[in-house]
Amino acid sequence: MTTNYKTTLLMPKTDFPMKGNLGKNEINIQKHWQKLDLYQKKLQQNQDNNPFILHDGPPYANGNIHMGHALNKILKDFIVRFRSMQGFYTPLIPGWDTHGLPIEAAVLKKTSKNAFTRKPLLDKCQEFALENVNNQKHQFQRLGILGDWQNPYLTLDKTFVSDQVRIFGQMVDKGLIFKALKPIHWSPTLESALAEAELEYHNHQSPSVYVAFSMKKLDIFDNVALVIWTTTPWTLPANVAIAVHPEKEYQLIEVLQKRYLVGTKNIPFLQKVFAWNKENIKVVATFEGKTLEHLTYQNHLVSKFGKIILSQHVLDGEGTGLVHIAPGHGLDDFLVGQKYNLDVVCSIDKKGMMTDVSKYQGLFYTKANEAIISDLEKDHSLLKADVILHSYPHDWRTKKPVISLALPQWFVSIKKIKSLLLEETQKVKWIPRWGELKMTNMITNREDWNISRQRTWGVPIPIFYTETHQPILDLKLINHVADLFEQHGMDIWYEWDVKKLLPENYINPQSPNNLFTKELDIMDVWFDSGTSYSVFKKRNQVLQSDVYLEGSDQYRGWFNSSLITSVATQNQAPYKTVITHGFVFDGEGKKMSKSLGNVIDPLTVAEQKGADIIRLWVANTNYNLDVRINPSILKQVEDLYRKIRNTFRFMLGNLDNFKKDTNYIAFEQRTFIHQAMMLDFEEVLKNVLHSYDTYNFEGVLRHLFPFITNKISAFYLDFAKDILYIEKEDHKERKMIQSTIYDLLLSLLQVLTPIIPHTTSEVYGFFPFAVEKDIYLEKMPQLKARPTSHLLLEYHKFLTLRKNVLQYLEKARQSGLINSSLQAHITLSLTQEEMHALDVLQIKDQLHQLFIVSKVTLQLKDTFDVKVAKASGYACQRCWNVVITKPLTPLCTRCQNILK
């Protein structure tokens, strides 16, 4: 009867499960965190240390979270967890953007627009926003995001609104807020103004018309037409001037008995447009642009005369060299019109309907285009009509085209602070680096910021008007309103009459009858979120955050508005570092949509596969660019996760019965091969910690995962089996290996906690001699200052040598010479340099274990070589090394001694 020697082996033993079952287990781990109050406990641990503030940009409180939200919040969680484990005090205040059109539109969608008076609409909007905040809060928590979830900041909170109004007041006091009639981006669909940040540019079909305006007869200008080109025929009834460039050359040409005035450099382009033969073009006269100033022409559409003016914004190339000017429908037109005191005529109203300035009154502007083109043709003023596809601004919410319309609006003066904005932009660290150029260009080209909106759900613009309709720009008055809002909420702006809103006994010389009115427009929601740094003041934290991290679309949005309000009031940027991530697409780089059936829902993935799988996917992407996800990509991430988990399990299993207080052997007392393993790992740790420090999470895995799979699992733990399983429990080298495994595992758990916190928390629960109640309460590994270079150099030479030996063994296995490496006896020919490496590491007697063979014979030669032979003798029935010379002997001498 054969003896079962397996029972004499010290096999790995652990209750840590092989299968993660993350969908269910993560919820239990999160309950463990909640019971510990883990977020607050970590803050208390670091409360006396330097702060590190990541300011959470507020997502919009509308709908469930999507994979873009998951990417954003998980990246932030990586940073906060890492910095807190470094020892920084890292409060994370989650926030939500709770005002604005999408919420108002969603509420109105459920009933007719006229069914609500203002107060019930405000109540319904608030109810809708809070419901979505609560929903998203639980969804973010399911992803393992830590933060002060009990005390988030909401842009609808009384304290937030009052602080926002105070910031507005400071900007008023500095002369940065003004009301003016200006052309703005206007949505006729929403009947509201839009900021630059609310525009998207899409390809759009527009009419393309070339129109001839008859010049008033004067000497040479008899029967001459000024030729203009426009893609907005509906603006022609609002035309009051035609602009030419003062320094450019113009020619009066005759083509087939018709006379036109056009730019000289535009003639080749016009030849193609009108199919003119060059020989049919006769140049009658040549002029410098400035000589044409004040000449007049007739606009037959409205039977009015306009004049030629000079402007620098007239360009060569495409077009005619003359620009149709309608100050009511374009900022450049408006600005040049101011110089000439031109009338601001608007041919359409807020609904996009034509006004009474023309016979087209009542037509929607797109319908008016057709009628205008028809009338121009009848009048013989139309030279050519076509349709072009070009980039055109659309409202980013409705996806409908916007128009330019002159209306009285409230603005922030960018011009006054532009130089300081640019100066502060240069002080910020931008990741990626091109972010600085992008923001610089945006600020350089930015016009005054239109902050008024003609909607209901938002923060009122806290301005009163005198009897003469003059706005009262008074800091004390605005701060008084802010105090009222903080006490009673912003709805009082609509519920209370003006006198109740004003300070008691308030008087103003411009209102002798003590009559006042109030502004009914609300603030742009970007002004709301753009003042969110104010939440730190009431929590006794610095206003300038260490990091803002959002999607790359926020250069025009939150990064921009926050910079403007902070520079305007604090004279500094609100952030030291700005990090951006790309958008999430499917595996083929396509946008996710329900219609395409390619949507990957983070909550579904968390339920089915686990939040740590999503987090590991995030860490494995170059998030600065657009990223991709699909089931195949997630499968690869699961495979990666499984290898990490299995390694953790094997390491835990081999720490069974390990008593750190009595079994642990310090680094200095371990033999060189185990020291070298730790030194090699510490080099990896340096790179891992540097990657974290530079927000390169892909780099964390790039350094860590190959080490786990190739160095720890495939090398160290593999060769260690012959010692861990076979030797006695108190064998010195076995304790060295266990001590090394202990150090490796603890450090791995520490550095992987920001990325897969549920898993590391679970492993830590099985970890012997855990000193904290959760791995998150540990610190990041502290790198030791050791003189490592010589030992590590020889160790790397050995690893290269071992890699070559394994290739020879694999060839022998494939040829059928051996079935497993333990059947091999290798003769190793080494150079002096290679032999020296073995001497330094003191591993010559251990090579059979390191190569997992039964016997190694060494020879000093000029060149490296390996000869593989089948080991002679019999295999030990316990350790399976082929070292027994006598038949029918079950155990080798080593195993016999162990079992004595």
UniProtKB/Swiss-Prot annotation:
EC numbers on record: 6.1.1.5
UniProt keywords, alphabetically: Aminoacyl-tRNA synthetase, ATP-binding, Cytoplasm, Ligase, Metal-binding, Nucleotide-binding, Protein biosynthesis, Zinc
Subcellular location: Cytoplasm
Short motif ('KMSKS' region): ranges: 591-595
Stored Gene3D superfamilies: 1.10.730.20, HUPs, Ile-tRNA synthetase CP2 domain-like
Residue numbers binding Zn(2+): 876, 879, 892, 895
UniProt keyword Cytoplasm present: yes
Keyword Metal-binding annotated: yes
Cofactor note: Binds 1 zinc ion per subunit.
Subunit record text: Monomer.
Name of the protein in question: Isoleucine--tRNA ligase
Species assigned in the record: Onion yellows phytoplasma (strain OY-M)
